[in-house]
Amino acid sequence: MPMKYANLSASRISFKKWFCLPVTCLCLLVTQAQVSRYHYTTDKKAEGRSGAVVSAHPLASKVGRDILQQGGNAIDAAIATQLALAVVYPGAGNIGGGGFLIAHLANGRNIALDYREKAPAAATRDMYLDAKGNPRLDLSQDGHLAAGVPGTVAGLFASMKYAKLPFNTLVRPAIDLAEKGFAITASQAASFNAHKKEFLKLNTAPTAFVKDKEWKAGDLLVQKDLANTLKRIRDKGPAGFYEGETARLIVEEMKKGKGIISLDDLKQYEAKERTAMAFPYKKHLVITMPLPSSGGIILQQMLKMIEYRDIKNMKFQSAASVQLMTEAERRAFADRAEFLGDPDFVKVPVQQLTDSLYLAERMKDFEPGKAGNSKTTLAGTVKESEETTHLSVIDAAGNAVSVTTTLNGSYGSRTVVSGAGFLLNNEMDDFSVKPGVPNMYGAVGNEKNAIAPGKRMLSSMTPTIVLKNNKPYLVTGTPGGTTIPTSVFQTIVNMIDFGMTPGDAVNKPKFHHQWLPDELFVEKDFDAVTLQQLKAMGYKINARGDIGRVELIQVVNKKITAVADKRGDDDAKAY
């Protein structure tokens, strides 16, 4: 570490409500977006009337808020925030992964951008099976072969046609943070230390995330190779990533670990603009992501399965309300496993799966007071990571943006492209490696989500915007693998049905059921009396760590309330 930063290494920071380092003399004034990498606060709630950004890291939220204050719109802020997250939140923020964007523009137009990763052209259906046909999940989850063709950079530039500011302005703060470094948080230090062995095992060259001594809160993370990659993207647009030097470095990295992404795979990647899903729920309009995200379909199914039941009077986290929502989750995930896949490759009966009569039929065998059974509750009959990151943005004009991006697992494949400084995803594990075999999140699938060259793997990401009286009311989403749609589901119900404040809707304990395994996952601070009642109904309870990290913006009478989840370093900024 350079001598001028040595005092930072010894700094101890309590990262509860604030994060401060006494080195303001080193703060750099950056034209357009001022970023202090050594001194930044973490705000779990922010209010304003002009705009707001909520993301997984305080510096990224500040970058986005600054872009809004400089005259950028919500799309500008979302792009700049994503780029900043690629630097300051390397566990999931990325340029080596993919994601989805949902936007509702002030002119009433809805936008759905799909920049999900794709299987390389050399991918085969059984590429992760051994000679006996048994799955090798280490190959689909770890290292070079686990990586799909990245889509994030293509997604950023596909967003630019709705932006106001030049890309150079939007990427500048990220370049600065990567080149000069920033002070890491306590949780980031712990995460780097916990993953050190994997970084060493899965990389052929030193990475910025490994050093001889243990990381501590306040240490500087400098990523010069990443800064240079961002500069190439700044100067050459998408070609700065998908062609030229960066593409060469990606392919060279592939060769070191038997990866299969080629120059042609990179050059041929395109983001897709799809038709956003939009459906009513109790006098609100929910706008969310279509396939290849399963999240939108699952969310619609779950909300519609409970819409005409009196959940409001069941009360929040009562055994009755949790049971009702759990059984909706069970049925939606059973359908996910059976029917969903990339719509460009397989026929998916979306209209039937979201039909009100079909969903009523799905809940016909629901018995209040008695747990369902995933052995008998199968997919319906039709006629035909958790390491992700989310950001929510709104601007003064009423443009709202909800973005979820991912590397899949924490730090993706844990493989850094040598010389380019960014992590590759391990999204190939989101395919059905073998029908009925669960992925790292326990989700199962069948042939509809089987591996095929150029195919997009099924996702659970659920970026969502809720309108009230045709104007943005909620902008929300979360990381969390298969817990994403259930966390968004519960947050919407908390707000609309239970009338919670945004803070309570985000931070109250959550639960999750995904059909298989047939277990009800709950956070450790879940109500003990309710748990006993659920056990008496026949549910197998599995207490676990955090479920979701929701980023929520609410707009009421032009007052903006932005809330960042207490479960991480997440941060809200507004003005």
Positions of the model-derived regions?
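Active-site rim segments in enzyme catalytic domains, especially the processed small/beta chain
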Residues: 87-112, 260-262, 400-468, 498, ...
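Noncatalytic scaffold domains of N-terminal-nucleophile
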Residues: 34-62, 74-75, 79-236, 241-243, ...
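Alpha-helical support elements that line or immediately flank enzyme active sites
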Residues: 68, 154-162, 236, 240-243, ...
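Bacterial Sec-dependent N-terminal signal peptides
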Residues: 1-36
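Active-site Gly/Thr loop motif
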Residues: 261-282, 357-383, 424-463
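Internal maturation/activation junctions in enzymes
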Residues: 308-407, 419-420, 435-436, 444, ...
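Extended C-terminal subregions enriched in glycine
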Residues: 455, 497-545
